[in-house]
Amino acid sequence: AVPALTANPSEFSARIAANSSIVPLMNQDLIRPLDDLVKKYGKGIQDSQLITIDGKVMAVAFMANTQHLYYREDVLKDLGIAIPKTYEEVVAASEKIRASGKMQYPYAAAYKAGWNLAEEFVNMFIGHGGEFFKSGSAQPNINNAKGVATLNMLKKLSELSNPDYLTHDSEAIKVEWESGNVALMTLWASRSGTLLDDEGDPNITKATKLTGPATVGGGNIPAATLWWDGFTLAKNRPDADAEATFRALAHAASNKKMVADAADQAVWLVEGFVPGPKSIGVIEAVKMGAKPYPMLPQMGLMHGALGSEIVEFLQGKESAEQALKDV
């Protein structure tokens, strides 16, 4: 996206962005503030859809996402296990499932080395109450007790997962679930539609239930981040082009008919959206006070470093302190 938007005129007039991907676009001054266009043509857009950064509207969000728990109701019931609300309970439940002989690797999350693994660290660190950078600076602030506790929990969960967990992204763990190998899973809310459709084993589909994200370490906010998807407008395009693009996309991002027709395809931020069963994870995350993924200029670099540096700790080749020091 960056090269396409850097061209003058840019190759696209709009770019779909999220919490993390908007930061490089802003850092390089590639997208334009939308305040005037919102005032003029944003009648159907709700205030909650406006992504405001440094006092300027830089994006219009249309859907929300988060990672939360999925569980097999039948497996938990058979073993008398309550629905886990904390990661400590997820570990205990997974150990009980393994001990019963029902499943050898009862837990799954997207631990693929790189972006996915780093996202799991981000979620767990936030759940422990961590702050990624020292106040008012770009200096990392993860090599501490909260960082170590985060890594130790990720390690415990990885030991209850398929041994190939470092290659497993969201699609791979979805396949594990649909194959009946997993009873507890942390996965994106946006993936719930394909897990609850009519295409897989009907018994697994029927037993697949959704709940909110887990907390960790005695914390009271979820070990999860809230995400938004929305549209931004390219700076390197004529004003008339930006205006026409905004009008078209603002119509789409406030279209009540679309929201009604596609109510179970996403958690829409559009007025008139009625949440269905597939939205429960995001709705619960919001109720529990989940924090948004940090929109900080330096967060991209940290995310990239985390995805590679904590692999050796999970493989038992490095201490938690050394892994965090390497970030």
Q: What feature does the model see in each segment?
A:
Residues 1, 90, 97, 175-180:
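Hydrophobic residues within well-ordered alpha-helices
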Residues 1-45, 74-85, 176, 183-184, ...:
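Extracytoplasmic "Venus flytrap"/periplasmic binding protein-like
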Residues 3-6, 10-15, 41-75, 105, ...:
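A structural signal for short loop-to-beta-strand junctions that line the ligand-binding cleft
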Residues 17-66, 82, 91, 117-120, ...:
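Hinge/lid segment of periplasmic solute-binding proteins
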Residues 32-46, 106-112, 128-149, 197-208, ...:
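Short, solvent-exposed loop/beta-turn-alpha elements that line the ligand-binding surface or hinge
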Residues 53, 58-62, 67, 91-139, ...:
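Extracytoplasmic/periplasmic solute-binding protein
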Residues 93-96, 136-166:
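Glycine-centered hinge/linker elements that transmit conformational signals in sensory
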Residues 190-205, 216-308:
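C-terminal lobe and pocket-closing loops
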